[in-house]
Amino acid sequence: MDAATLTYDTLRFADTPDFPETAEPVWVLGRKYSALTEKEQLLNDITSRLWFTYRRNFQAIGGTGPTSDTGWGCMLRCGQMIFAQALICRHVGRDWRWDKQKPKGEYLNILTAFLDKKDSYYSIHQIAQMGVGEGKYIGQWYGPNTVAQVLRKLAVFDQWSSIAVHIAMDNTVVVDEIRRLCRAGSGESSDAGALSNGYTGDSDPSCAQWKPLVLLIPLRLGLSEINEAYIETLKHCFMVPQSLGVIGGRPNSAHYFIGYVGDELIYLDPHTTQLSVEPSDCSFIEDESFHCQHPPCRMHVSEIDPSIAVGFFCSSQEDFEDWCQHIKKLSLSGGALPMFEVVDQLPLHLSNPDVLNLTPDSSDADRLDRFFDSEDEEFEILSL
């Protein structure tokens, strides 16, 4: 079995085509590159993204559960990737680049939070077990919304990062809700002290008035296939400076999309089974397997499943206001159909608490999460 997996993975890497030589601009998480003159910088950027794949031989989930997530954990791994990118932006900045000769500092703290251990904040163990509260048994396949909801709940325990996570439902981003969320608890210290992951965090004065924001927007862009009217808007999401990318893929096959070139989406593929990594006694982590060191995968944008979640990271209130302006300009430009709208206050037709309540601590949150998660079983809408 292991030999077969190794052969399969080796062939997958060997068959990955090189990046195209094209004059069209390449966009990766808010950065623009030329494939003709900046190919090395482009590939270095992509390689620097944390790449989470299937793993085997990790601690049994829940003590008696699975020791591998092969076949069921791809969306969980994609959720880890988009959230890891948020933490990279939060702690080391979007322009940070991986140096495999000198992996250290806050980067290792980030990676530690995703290791396959029960006490890592965003481990496969934590996501799978928190998912039980979302109505998903351990080993069941997730859709984009479920993994977003689970990550939001896990982030509460990550005091080192001290981030606010907002999931915008019903294709609507309500600015007032986000302002309240990011200002909540601003008088509390963000010093986490000694954390369960084995590292310490220091308070960040920049968080005193506004918590850095991770904004996740679950969307449905069609029935069994994406509506072509959304394609240009989807591409634009990778051009916004605050972009975290998109989690989605094909039915029952999730990918983490990080950019595009022409009509092709660029993505990291979690469907490779690797051995679980354990840090050594001196806290050294063998981290090369967490970075994709072959040319990235690509697929035509029309092939993406319509059920996705789009992510953005806003480091400050000014950054969030800048994001709002980007999105509003896009909606006014005409042509492409907006995937979601940004409004200052909750529209009246959504304000009835018996219909919808999107406040973070709403008692109806679990009911709403499941209501909006009907794509999870097959990762595409089967009926309306």
From Swiss-Prot:
Class of enzymatic activity (EC top level): hydrolase
Record keyword 4Fe-4S present: no
Keyword tags: Autophagy, Cytoplasm, Cytoplasmic vesicle, Endoplasmic reticulum, Hydrolase, Mitochondrion, Protease, Protein transport, Thiol protease, Transport, Ubl conjugation pathway
Motif (LIR): 379-382
Active site: 74, 269, 271
The organism's place on the tree of life at top rank: Eukaryota
Gene Ontology cellular component list: autophagosome; cytoplasm; cytoplasmic vesicle; cytosol; endoplasmic reticulum; mitochondrion
InterPro entries on file: ATG4_LIR, Papain-like_cys_pep_sf, Peptidase_C54, Peptidase_C54_cat
Subcellular location: Cytoplasm; Cytoplasm, Cytosol; Cytoplasmic vesicle, Autophagosome; Endoplasmic reticulum
Reactions it catalyzes: [protein]-C-terminal L-amino acid-glycyl-phosphatidylethanolamide + H2O = [protein]-C-terminal L-amino acid-glycine + a 1,2-diacyl-sn-glycero-3-phosphoethanolamine; [protein]-C-terminal L-amino acid-glycyl-phosphatidylserine + H2O = [protein]-C-terminal L-amino acid-glycine + a 1,2-diacyl-sn-glycero-3-phospho-L-serine
EC number, as in UniProt: 3.4.22.-
Keyword set includes Endoplasmic reticulum: yes
Major place of residence: cytoplasm
BP-aspect Gene Ontology terms: aggrephagy; autophagosome assembly; autophagy; microautophagy; mitophagy; otolith mineralization completed early in development; piecemeal microautophagy of the nucleus; protein processing
An MF annotation (GO) of this entry: cysteine-type endopeptidase activity
Family per record: Belongs to the peptidase C54 family.
Function: Cysteine protease that plays a key role in autophagy by mediating both proteolytic activation and delipidation of ATG8 family proteins. Required for canonical autophagy (macroautophagy), non-canonical autophagy as well as for mitophagy. The protease activity is required for proteolytic activation of ATG8 family proteins: cleaves the C-terminal amino acid of ATG8 proteins to reveal a C-terminal glycine. Exposure of the glycine at the C-terminus is essential for ATG8 proteins conjugation to phosphatidylethanolamine (PE) and insertion to membranes, which is necessary for autophagy.
Domain notes: The LIR motif (LC3-interacting region) is required for the interaction with ATG8 family proteins. Required for proteolytic activation and delipidation of ATG8 proteins.
Protein name (record): Cysteine protease ATG4B
Provenance organism: Xenopus laevis (African clawed frog)
Gene from which the chain derives: atg4b
